[in-house]
Amino acid sequence: MKQFIEFIPLIVFFAVYKFYDIYMATGALVVVTGLQLAYSWIRYRKVEKMQLFTFLLVGFFGGLTVFFHDDTFIKWKVTVINVLFALGLLISRYGFGKNLIKQMLGKELQAPDPVWDRVNLGWAGFFTVCGLLNLYVAFNLPQEMWVNFKVFGLLGMTLVFTLLSGVYLYRHLPAEQKNEMKK
C-alpha cells in the first residue's frame, strides 16, 4: 500500500495534464505531494527524508512553473532530482564512506562490499543517465512526449534497473541466503 501511495502524485499529474494543461497538472502535483507528506505524518508519525526532499523540490520547481507560467522549471526538476540522487550516492560513499544502497538493503541482503559498491555506482550512473535523457526529451521533443517520458519512460527504466540490480545482487548472495529465499 505504501508503494502505491508514492505513485499517486505521478498518476494525478498525468491525469490532470491529459484533461487540462501542464500548469494545472503541476499545481495538482504540488498539492498532492503535500497531501502525501501529510498522510505519511498522520499515518506513520514519520516522514522519510527522501519524501521531504522530493516535496521541497516539487514545491520549489512546481511553484516557479505555476507562478511564471513557464514549464521550463518543472522540466528541470526531473533532471535536478536525478543528478542530486546520483551526487548523494557518490558523495556519501566516497566522501563519507557510507554506501547508501547497502544501508537501505544490507539488512536483508548479505553481499560483499565490492558488490555493494558496484550497485551504488550503477545507480549513480543510472540517475545521471535519467537526468541527461530528461534534458534531451524535455527540450527537444514536444511537451506531451516529455510528459509521457516522465510518467512512463522513467518509471519503466527504473523498474527494469531495479530488476537488474536485484538479479546482480542475488548472484552474489551467500548460498544459505539464496536457499532461504527459495523457501
From Swiss-Prot:
Q: What is its main location?
A: membrane
Where is the protein situated, by its record's location annotation? Cell inner membrane
Keywords on record: Cell inner membrane, Cell membrane, Membrane, Transmembrane, Transmembrane helix
Transmembrane annotation, as ranges: 4-24, 50-70, 72-92, 119-139, 149-169
Keyword Transmembrane helix set for record: yes
Pfam families, alphabetized: IspA (PF04279)
| Topology within the bilayer | Multi-pass membrane protein
Cellular compartments per GO CC: plasma membrane
| Chain's role | Plays a role in cell envelope biogenesis, maintenance of cell envelope integrity and membrane homeostasis.
Q: Which family does it belong to?
A: Belongs to the YciB family.
The entry's protein name is Inner membrane-spanning protein YciB
